[in-house]
Amino acid sequence: MAKQKIRVRYAPSPTGHLHIGNARTALFNYLFARHYKGKFILRIEDTDQSRNIADGEKSQIDNLKWLGMDWDEGPDKPGEYGPYRQSERKGIYQPLIDQLVAEGKAYESYMTEEELAAQREEQKANGEMPHYVDEYAGLSPEQKEQKIADAKAAGIEPVIRFKVPTNTTYEWDDLVKGHISFESETIGGDFVIQKRDGMPTYNFAVVVDDHMMEISHVFRGDDHVANTPKQLMIYEALGWDAPQFGHMSLIINTETGKKLSKRDESILQFIEQYRSLGYLPEAMLNFIILLGWSPVGESEIFTLREFVKMYDEKRLSKSPAAFDAKKLEWINNQYVKAADEDRIMHSALLQLINAGKIEKNPAPMKVEWARKLINLFKRQMSYTAQIVEFTELFFNGPENIDEEAKEELATDDALPVLKALEKQFSDLPVFDTVNILAAIKAVQKETGIKGRKLWMPIRIAITHEMHGPELPESLELLGYELSMQHLRAMIEELS
């Protein structure tokens, strides 16, 4: 990339919590800035006051930090281009709106919401795409003046609309999609740049902020393509150069084949949801970066530092990115297996406490028992909340045996193995992994039964499961009393 000052931004609205798609936007801007040794700016676009939620901004900031991102400027890191909340920049926008009105490039519009809705319905009934029709079209200056005076007398507050140039093409070379162009007649007519409450709309504020903050590149979601020609018009009207744009592909839900929608509750879509399940931030980050960007080679597991080093915006995909929850689980499992024991212990223990399986502030002996239990299942866990399901046997006893498992117990070898094991267990001095394994080997020697025919009846009889972690370790943690109780119950059932 040619030498230039690189400044990019992530600019969320505090109308909700950090979504997977927004996290991806933040990450791609972050990687671009860090790869080219530029600046990454966090800006809060809170102009839609009615939709902002109380902890929206805090959620965005907390979850971005949890993912491992930091920024050079933002609400919590003031710089020379601040303020970094749009609600605090109203004094910057107003003179520019006044300028456009004075130059005849924007004007006051007094159409009410009811009139606009009626206009749209009429257009739909006529088979037209809804668009704003100039309310002053065909009026003489005197008639226009009277119309405005009547609206003011009725107490109607105006919006400010930008006057869309006619017969003009707006085009740009998109860093992801290639060349894109729009005809000015296709964007829906003159559009609002200032709302009735005096706040600027998104399309106006974002242009002013990006220009004032000297943003060089804008990477954002595909859904912003239609906003770009409107923004290019405003840049042109104010005599400013536009930044370079890159619009990232849609994210598709692999389960439905449809665009990922915040209203689709069939799939978890917010970073906080994954945090609460015990996903690791570096795994989430790894997965999100692969949504629409591909590294060179076959490997898919990289650290953030490695992603920064290898990042190339030319490898951003034009095709929709597939959100595959199973792939996310696989990636997180790779990180869980490689993670420090204490880190997984802390996360999984918290899951057990929150589920009411272990009391708060457990005694040291209980903590040590839980550590062994968690380590037993560590390699199986895709995320640490699974520990609650995986360890059900150790807290609530075994589940009902399914038909396939019952078939394993219906063989001629099952009952002799279980009876021999009961005797061996009864004679053990200490019920630990070493002695349990020795007892099972003694059963093998006594009965001549080995392999699957030896191990499977024991596992099913005591755990009611056909699969699980190492059996001797599992039985030690289950304890002598419960292991013998389950074993004897099965012997009685089969006898």
UniProtKB/Swiss-Prot annotation:
According to UniProt, the name of this protein is: Glutamate--tRNA ligase
**Annotated motif 'HIGH' region, positions:** 12-22
Question: Motif ('KMSKS' region) spans which residues?
Answer: 259-263
Supply the Pfam families for this chain.
Anticodon_2 (PF19269), tRNA-synt_1c (PF00749)
User: PANTHER family, alphabetically?
Assistant: GLUTAMATE--TRNA LIGASE, GLUTAMATE--TRNA LIGASE, MITOCHONDRIAL-RELATED
Q: Cross-referenced CDD domains, in alphabetical order?
A: GluRS_core
Q: Where in the cell is it found?
A: Cytoplasm
Question: Which Gene Ontology cellular-component terms appear in the entry?
Answer: cytosol
What residues bind ATP, as annotated? K262
Task: Say which domain of life the source belongs to.
Answer: Bacteria
**Does the record bear Cytoplasm in its keywords?**
yes
- What gene does the UniProt entry assign to this protein? gltX
Keyword ATP-binding belongs to the record: yes
Task: Tell me where the transmembrane regions lie.
Answer: none
Protein task: Catalyzes the attachment of glutamate to tRNA(Glu) in a two-step reaction: glutamate is first activated by ATP to form Glu-AMP and then transferred to the acceptor end of tRNA(Glu).
